[in-house]
């Protein structure tokens, strides 16, 4: 047999392995949903099942790809080179082992979900620090370990036999006519293998933005369905990824006395009993004559600064017409540039719910976040000023555990896509209009109450599925005027159309709220920028800046300088200074925007009067010391608690 024959034969067996494991994971996924189907919420449709299987299939391409790659490297490649290489036997052992392991993991998952209402999660890490004997006894007496494990092994052996039979099926003989034909067929195979490899790497997509991965897999209005999307390898990888992040960021290499020195450097009270209390602020003047009953903060998905800037004035006049109208109002103030907490939505949410600077640790996965309140978090600051706090999310509360995290951090109520009409919803949740409509209904049902509404939108995000024509978007009104950084392509117009939609629905919502409560106060900002597809490289402000708009009766423009800047979590103390009364106190790590800092920073960028910069290693040493102090205090607060 020549090498081409051996290679194509091995490749066919690899393809059969690919098909086998894709079917196996899909079967396990379906069986898992069926097993717990009684837990599905009312209104779950067959289409939700199919979406789960589809997203799961795409995500499992990563796992399937790794298994098949092991067979390709261990069997197909050496078998092509060496005639007597035992490739068939090696491939069989790889596939048999993988089939057996994933069958046993599936049985374990069934019991695990019964206990934790989740597939494998961070409780695995916590369990490693637990009483192993107690865990073993619990498994035996409560969850049938002694009969479930043998059953899993028996079923695994049966499925493994099916695997061998399936992969052992006959293969087709491929030949070539001459050397030219060999080169042609080899090139075609190389291209096909490369495309399949990319699709496996990115979960059925050609790039990361459109991929399905464990971090964005929670796309359905059911915890069960969202957990079913993850196969067991991806669920375990989730645990590994989160733990790796924690370990890399949780090394505290300073003492409690050094912590106090850092607090002192930032102007905190080292004699306070807690870190939060060390950064207590007293409101020195009442800024708004009438305290608003309704306070609304809109954290807009990918709501970026660039359409507000002079350089992009022509497209921005239409794309963010509503946001610009708020800025133009005499009852508003705004920053020239605001630095986002991070480059994703969850870092932004973490920042606002904790009031701490970004430290590459996800507080929403930390035990401290579920034991005690962060006094510097936006919900607790607003509660201390007398407001009921409500979190609104256009997506699903199971995403990043945002429901549990927000409720643990001072929000009185939480509403997500599952609580709202599913009009035009997609994998990420309901359209912004449906979200805002639900909030308006809530406001009408609770007249006169002092309520702080924290709103996290979703529509300005792939897959960009809003019916823009029905929503009223007119692409002819987007004036690019030969702008070289933005191309008028269908995809670009679709992106900008969703940008317009997010801004438009927000503006309509603001007007509707004013009709309910004319004295309402609004804060409009973005979770991050850095998502829009520019045709060419752009400056840092264009790429990464977000707006921060404060709008409501009694606000004065002169309260913020035209060239003011800040970092996202400074919105928290600024809001407290606006709605609070003279003499009231609140806790905040950073000062408000009314007390300008010499510089501002986020996870990557920094800004001062000289400009906006990318690399923090180039900042002055005095700045570095302050940044280090903020980060170390935040790290201590998240990992070791509040006590001083």
Label for each model-derived stretch:
Residues 267-644:
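Solvent-exposed soluble domains appended to multi-pass membrane proteins
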Residues 73, 132-139, 237, 259-266, ...:
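Generic structural signal of hydrophobic/aromatic residues within well-ordered alpha-helices
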Residues 156, 162-172, 259-279:
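Short, intrinsically disordered, low-complexity segments enriched in Ser/Thr and Pro
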Residues 238-271:
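Extracytoplasmic/periplasmic/luminal assembly and interaction segments
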Residues 86-89, 248-257, 365-370, 588-590:
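Short alpha-helical "patches" and their helix-cap loops
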Residues 2-247:
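Transmembrane and membrane-interface helices of multi-pass
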